A protein has these predicted regions:
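Amphipathic alpha-helices that form helix-helix packing interfaces
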Residues: 30-33, 113, 117-120, 124-127, ...
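Glycine-rich anion/phosphate-binding loop at the beta-strand->alpha-helix junction
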Residues: 164, 212-305, 310
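Conserved hydrophobic residue
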Residues: 40, 45, 248-249, 367
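Alpha-helical support elements that line or immediately flank enzyme active sites
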Residues: 31-32, 105-117, 226-235, 240, ...
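A short, charged helix-loop
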Residues: 197-213
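Short, well-ordered beta-strand elements within core beta-sheets of diverse protein domains
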Residues: 152, 220-228, 356-364
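Glycine-rich cofactor/substrate-binding loops
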Residues: 1-22, 26, 62-66, 83, ...
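A helix-coil-helix interface module used to build multimeric assemblies
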Residues: 1-187, 191-197, 206, 259-262, ...
């Protein structure tokens, strides 16, 4: 992945230096375990641990000649170890090292992503409670539907990210597996009990059965889960892009004093972070398809998956780490306009209460079909002639013959529409930390925002 989208710690994990360091960790663990079993001289295991090292450039130089990265690695390490290097890689095949080390790399990458998910959870929780009672219009098919609160929208995102966290914990655990079962998985050169001890030494579980490689359904599940996370972030970003549209302007990305939106149009304040999130999410989703293609390998293994994984595993984890950090900052600094939300909600003159009026008329004794007809008739007139729906309803004799003015007014009561938001919040956040309503932004994170805006 290009440096532009790589955060330092995740980039370090996927560096060549760290990859080879993990390979060496597997080699050392294997040699020491074999030494404890009396299969390798203890002085050899000690020499490999104490002298085992490598130079990345030397490995690359050897690989250019031998055309095999693991042989290049073991050759470079052997040069450092000396005579005892004859016990290096004893009883192992290349993918015993590569797959087991890859599990270690993914374990470390997963820890960062899990931390990222928890941080996003916390920010979504805080902002959800901040806007728990901030009314706005809910939209279906892009059209005004019924009132919600902005906090309810944030609670939805919190719940989805929580599910992603649970899914990713399972996927990460499924990838925490090593194998040292040899070239075809039959354990011919290394007893399965020793294989388990080596994996345990590395903090990994042992694949119960494998071929030359750990089976790639695990990797497909892992990358698919990353793609789901990216898709959820895309969903959040897409919503913010809509809310920032000039015609809507209910929320927008924080825009710093020195920021520029366009080289040609000085007035522009574009949702560039949200657009970046949506764009990079497409890359992660496309990687999931490649991961699925890797499941069907020939017989006990071919190498068609290897080149793919050199791209999709680092890139997918790097991108999701980046996307989660970007989304967390986006939500944390999001500028919200409660007055604009209320104005947009009221812009249709009460049309968004048609569903409640329909129910109230049915409860008052009108047949549902008749109630639907009379409410829709007034709604379409309000829509087509740009008239206030509420006033039309008040003048409709068919409606007033079933409902008194106070009853009609109650159908247009915004608080009535939102009366169960507290119960929904209690259900969503029942297992999370208690929150006070309208929590302020964390100290030191406040930003100057436009007038009549809430961040």
């Amino acid at each position: 992945m290009i440096k532009r989208y790589t955060r330092p710690e995740m980039g370090r994990i996927w560096s060549d230096e760290n990859k080879f360091r993990m390979w060496l960790a597997v080699e050392i663990a294997a040699t020491e375990t074999l030494a404890e079993a009396g299969l390798v001289p203890r002085e050899a295991a000690r020499a490999i641990r104490e002298l085992g090292d490598f130079d990345v450039e030397r490995i690359q130089s050897i690989e250019a000649e031998v055309k095999h990265d693991v042989i290049a690695f073991t050759t470079a390490v052997a040069e450092k170890v000396g005579p005892q290097s004859r016990w290096l890689h004893f009883g192992l095949t290349s993918n015993d090292v590569v797959d087991t080390a890859q599990a270690l790399l993914l374990r470390d990458a997963s820890r960062l992503i899990l931390d990222d998910l928890r941080q996003l959870q916390q920010v979504l929780r805080r902002r959800a409670f901040e806007f728990q009672d901030t009314p706005m219009i809910g939209r279906t098919h892009g059209i005004h539907a019924e009132p919600i609160t902005f906090g309810l929208k944030l609670a939805n995102w919190f719940s989805e990210i929580s599910r992603n966290l649970e899914r990713f914990e399972r996927a990460a655990e499924e990838m925490r597996v090593g194998k040292l079962s040899g070239a075809v998985g039959n354990g011919a050169h290394l007893d399965p009990e020793l294989e388990e001890k080596i994996c345990e030494r590395l903090g990994l579980q042992t694949a119960s059965v494998s071929s030359q490689v750990i089976q790639r359904d695990r990797h497909a599940y892992y990358v698919a889960t990353l793609a789901l996370i990216a898709s959820s972030l895309d969903k959040i970003a897409t919503e913010i892009r809509h809310l920032q549209r000039t015609e809507v302007r209910e929320a927008e990305e924080y825009f710093s004093e020195q920021q520029k939106g366009s080289s040609a149009m000085p007035h522009k304040r574009n949702p560039v972070t949200s657009e970046q999130i949506s764009g990079l999410a497409r890359v992660v989703r496309s990687n999931a398809q490649a991961a699925f293609e890797n499941v069907a390998l020939w017989h006990e293994r071919d190498i068609s998956h290897s080149s793919v994984e050199r791209v999709i595993l680092p890139d997918s984890t790097i991108l999701v780490d980046y996307l989660l950090a970007k989304t967390t900052a986006l939500i944390d600094t999001l500028v919200v306009y409660p007055e604009r939300m209320l104005r947009n909600l009221e812009s249709t003159g009460g049309l968004v209460f048609s569903g409640q009026l329909l129910l109230d008329l049915a409860e008052a004794g009108m047949l549902r079909e008749d109630a639907y007809r009379v409410v829709q008739s007034n709604a379409m007139r309000a829509w087509n002639e740009d008239l206030p729906f509420r006033e039309l309803v008040m003048k409709d004799k068919e409606i007033t013959s079933h409902m008194q003015r106070g009853q009609i007014e109650r159908a247009f009561d915004l608080k009535r529409q939102l009366r169960n938001v507290d119960k929904i919040f209690a259900r969503v956040f029942k297992d999370s930390e208690p929150q006070a309503r309208h929590v302020e932004a964390r100290p030191g994170r406040a930003h100057k925002t436009p007038a009549k805006a809430s961040r």
